[in-house]
Amino acid sequence: MAGIRKKTAFFCQECGYESAKWTGQCPSCKAWNSMVEEPIRISSSKSSAAAARGLSGSRTPFSLGGDNRSLQPVPLSQVKDLAETRFSTGFSELDRVLGGGAVAGSLVLFGGDPGIGKSTILLQTSCHMAAAGISVLYISGEESLRQIKLRAMRIGSAPDTLKFLCETGLGTISDIILRSKPQVVVIDSIQTMYSDDIQSAPGSVSQVRETTAVLLRLAKETGITFFIVGHVTKEGTVAGPRVLEHMVDTVLYFEGDRYASYRILRGVKNRFGSTNEIGVFEMRREGLVEVPNPSEYMLSGRPLGSSGSAVTCSMEGTRPMLTEVQALVVRTNFG
């Protein structure tokens, strides 16, 4: 393509640091063997001006501030006061972790091990919100519509206000979102999305960073709430550059043994609430079910009157929880 030059650069998989040459240790986060080479594209001024007109090809600038020529710094006293708009997700446990419900225009990242139930909880949440009259668009890059329908039939029916789309192209997804204007968008998953402007494979550092940046601009400009699924690495962190967690508003981790029935939803970052709250769910055949009394789960199977066992109370956010503490004490020959 005329006016476009291609070259490669090295990116840190942990923090997203960019370097012109390879280094064994990232100069930013000090991680070893985290630099990977990826092609990047440098556009000419003409093509850059065309890109500034928006993802959909319109002449309306697509940026957080609109046309840069009309931007002016203003004091906070001239900014209109708007009440924080929250709405329920249909799960009281999820609302608790989010700080009282989802915030309009926020970007929420769901992380967790494969098979832990990330897609299931978001599909159930989408059904609950759609049943409450909220328009929801569920975008999947990992499953076909037939597979999603089979899973939806297992957990219950999906209302007609819940729309589904199987697509991974960021440009197409952005156009559909701007045309349909849903209130909530679910992306499953961010590692499958790609932008044509980045000449690298989906899931790479450049692709994850660019697609998340575009979704963030969409959320802030339109007021649409985004829930995006992120895969985790063997260390238990979200795959991709660490900058991904810094860009989003909320980071939630779905924890638990995939072979056990209980799951714990924990918030590690929340710009609109506390990160001390947790939500407890139980995985059943019909999907995830909330556990309103986690103490019962913590003490399940504890024999009454057993030695070496004590019950203590701890606070997880605003919720007191009873947990069992065990100690093994045996007689020794030292008196």
Regions found by a protein language model. Name each.
Residues 91, 152-179:
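Short glycine-rich substrate-engagement loop in P-loop NTPases that contacts/grips substrate
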